[in-house]
Each structure stands twice: as C-alpha cells, then as structure tokens.
Amino acid sequence: MQSWPDPEVPKLSGDSPALRLYDTADRAVRPVAPGPTATLYVCGITPYDATHLGHAATYVTFDQVNRVLRDQGHDVHYVQNITDVDDPLFERAERDGVDWRELGSEQIQLFRDDMTALRVLPPRDYIGAMESVDEVIEAVEKLLASGAAYVVDDPEYPDVYFRTDATEQFGYESGYDRATMARFFAERGGDPDRAGKRDPLDAVLWRAARDGEPSWEAPFGPGRPGWHIECSAIALNRLGIEFDIQGGGNDLIFPHHEFSAAHGEALTDSRRFARHYVHTGMVGLDGEKMSKSRGNLVFVSVLRRDGVDPAAIRLALLADHYRSDRMWTDDVLATAVDRLQRWRTAAAAPAGPDAAPTVARLRQHLADDLDTPKALDAVDAWCADVRTGIGSDPAAPAQIARAVDALLGVVIA
C-alpha cells in the first residue's frame, strides 16, 4: 500500500549520542543498539475514523525515534500496518450506510494527509491487513502444526485460537498479573467467554467466516485474520525476529503487543520478539479521557481545516514527555502557537548566538528517552537570547532552523 510523501530532512554535522528508550518489558530506560539498519515496527490505525490527537501523539513520537536514529547515521527500516479488516470498521460502515472498503480507503487517505501535514516520515513498508492475509494463513498453519494453536469445537464457527501457554515467557512484555490481563482482555477486543476455548485469555488467530463479513479461503477453513497475528506476520516477514523497536500507544501493551510478541516467538522458537517495547501515553481533553464513547475526540484534520498550523500541533504534542498521559486544552495549543511564532521570528533574525551548543543540547535531550520538553526548552533559550540581542553569528539562525527541522520535524525558516 502507498504511504505518503517523504519530506526532505536536512543533514546535520557533528555526532549524536546513543539513543536510550524506556522498555516496557524491562521496566527501565536502556540503550537502543541497532546495527547499521535500525528496525522499527509501529502499529497503525484501524481506518474507520479520522486521525485524532491520540493517534497523532503516537506517530509523532515514533517519528522522533526515526529522526534520532537517522541523525545517528542509521538507515531505518520502518514498518507500519493498517488494520483494514476489523469489527470497528464494519460497524462504522454499517452505521453510516457505506461500503466498509470505501470507508477504509477514505480514512486511510485522510491519515496520509494528516501525517504529511505533521511532517511524519513515512514507513518504508506500509502494509494493510488484506495485503498480508497469505502471510497470516502461513503463520497460522505453522502454529497449528506445532500445537501452539487449536481449532475450537464449534461446527458452525471453527475459529482458530492461540494457546496462552504456548510460550514459557508469556506475560513478560506487559508484566501484568492474571487479573489485570483478564480485565484488559475483556475491555480491548478479547472474547474471554467464547465457548470451547481452553483458556479465557487465548486469543483468536483466525475468525471463521460469518455472514456479512469478508473472508478468505484457508486450509483450516474460510475466515479472516485475528488482530494480533497480523502484526506478527507483517513484522517477521519484513524485519525478522528480535527487531529493534515495537511501538504503539500504552493501550496496546496488553493484549495486542503481548500476543503479537507471543505469536512471533512461538513461530520462531525465540525468547523475544523485539528488543525494545516502547509505548506512548494517552491524550485527554480538558481533564477527561479522550474517547469515541465520550464524543470528545479532537481530530488533526479538523484543526487543520480551522486554520491551525500543523507545526503548532506537532509542537503542542512534543511539549509533554511521550510516556506521560497529557491533556489537550485551548491553552496548550495557544502556547504552541506562540512558541512557533517566537521560533520563526528568531530564525529570521540576521544573527544569533553560536548554534553548536544548542544543537548539542537538542541531541542530548532527544537521545535521553526522547526528552522533548527539555529539547524545546533548549530552543526557547536560544530564541530568548536572540530577542535580547545576544550573539553575532550570522550563520546561527539558519543552523538552528536546520536542526529544528531535522530533529523535531518543525519548519521555522
């Protein structure tokens, strides 16, 4: 599937410190130590609605990871999926009286437009679930053959399930106890009460064909892929086992990332699917959790339509640490708009303080678990010096503008 245009990223001189990120599985900030090619997998959208700020915060975060790794000299093999076959898409299409394929296509294009506006670097591989069905079928066949999966005893709907006990290490990624797993499994798309399952937490690999749902032929019966195995197959077939970073929002820690890891590990007889599991916090609105049920989602496309500069949206999302849950308010956006104006005014100045120390601080803060608040503060400090007339280097404003573009994805000149 086509992604979106790749913005030009300025090349900076000098060296960048090694990137360190918090790993959910190890509960610690650890160095990311890729080879010449860094490998990154980020779970994509289910295209039944427009890109809201929670989505945007996640993709901007991993764009920061991408930019830091590139600045360190790595080639980055970035893979992102699209869950273009799933219940929420069917339900929204039925509600709106449209074909689910048309709805998915429209929302994917809107997502592309939003990512382009936010200057998010596109993935090298942008893969839809429908594109990967053959890969999923092959993976499910292997899991059935190894005993890691089973078919429920249901002549009408012989779904295929993954055994939670198929890997000894199941649960290491989230670190959750059984009760927490059970709660999140029920809340986040699981089916603990499905008759015929050997364990309430066993996750569906292949949903047998139902009336009114798309299906594909498979040796174990017609149906469609489960959510978790899609990501396992897509990642393994493009990045291999133990790729560098698996990323997404913290609502994906369990069950999605736990099971996609377990599927991949069972398929390859490996202990670890990814070297780092990295998760972003949630975005709320005016003191409340942002959710579809509350009807308080803030959409990037609506902000853009209302004339908000996408660079200001990006700066607003970078103002808090990526792992923190944060609130979106009018004041947050106003602060970002003001900051963007101050940065652009300073970048247009005829001269300013030497850029090298500020660029070094930018790199240092971003390498330290993406400390974007401190990175923004470093640019703020340079701009404040320009306003007070400190510094006489005529090359500095352009150098700062290049660094802000390359490292933060924000154009100020």
Curated annotation (Swiss-Prot):
Give the quaternary structure. Monomer.
The similarity annotation says:
Belongs to the class-I aminoacyl-tRNA synthetase family. MshC subfamily.
Q: One Pfam family this chain carries? A: tRNA-synt_1e
Please identify the protein, giving its name as recorded: L-cysteine:1D-myo-inositol 2-amino-2-deoxy-alpha-D-glucopyranoside ligase
Report if keyword Nucleotide-binding is assigned: yes
What is a biological process (GO) this protein takes part in? cysteinyl-tRNA aminoacylation
Q: Where is this motif: 'HIGH' region?
A: 45-55
Q: Which Gene Ontology terms cover its molecular function?
A: ATP binding; cysteine-glucosaminylinositol ligase activity; cysteine-tRNA ligase activity; zinc ion binding
According to the UniProt entry, where does the motif 'ERGGDP' region sit in this chain? 187-192
Assigned EC number: 6.3.1.13
Which cellular components does GO assign to this protein? cytosol
Q: Tell me which PANTHER family the record gives.
A: CYSTEINE--TRNA LIGASE, CYTOPLASMIC, CYSTEINYL-TRNA SYNTHETASE
Residues that bind Zn(2+): 43, 231, 256
Q: Which cofactor does it need?
A: Zn(2+)
